[in-house]
Amino acid sequence: MIFGIGTDMIEINRVVKACERKTFLTKIYTEQEQKLLLSDIRKAASNFAVKEAVVKMFGTGFRAIAPNEIEVLRDNLGKPYVNLYGNAEILAKEHNVERIHVSITNTKELVSAYVIGEIIRE
């Protein structure tokens, strides 16, 4: 059953520019994500869009969840997936959200992310 959906679109250059500030990187991205960004800084925008989509899926915005409590990584084939920590993980457990499906698409200037939170059991 679907718990919720979330979507976001962001300008890639805006996020890339913000990543020039170390404080932005540590506030927004986990250590694993920061390692990923070393190989492709444009992934910073993709990950940020996914984080925004996840908090929209929960209906909380970043009031209840810190951005670095949502980790966006890629599997061996490049498919994005989400790990939740802290308040994000607690919120998912409270609502029985066991799976978050992620889709990312981009142009040269924009990136869009779409997530679906799935309840496997009630």
Swiss-Prot record:
GO terms for biological process: fatty acid biosynthetic process. Its main location: cytoplasm. Its cofactor is Mg(2+). It catalyses: apo-[ACP] + CoA = holo-[ACP] + adenosine 3',5'-bisphosphate + H(+). The lineage of its organism: Bacteria, Bacillati, Bacillota, Clostridia, Lachnospirales. One of its GO terms (molecular function) is magnesium ion binding. GO terms for cellular component: cytoplasm. This is Holo-[acyl-carrier-protein] synthase. Keywords: Cytoplasm, Fatty acid biosynthesis, Fatty acid metabolism, Lipid biosynthesis, Lipid metabolism, Magnesium, Metal-binding, Transferase. It is found in: Cytoplasm. It comes from the Bacteria. Belongs to the P-Pant transferase superfamily. AcpS family. Transmembrane segments: none annotated. SUPFAM superfamilies: 4'-phosphopantetheinyl transferase. Its EC number is 2.7.8.7. Mg(2+) binds at residues 8, 52. Transfers the 4'-phosphopantetheine moiety from coenzyme A to a Ser of acyl-carrier-protein.
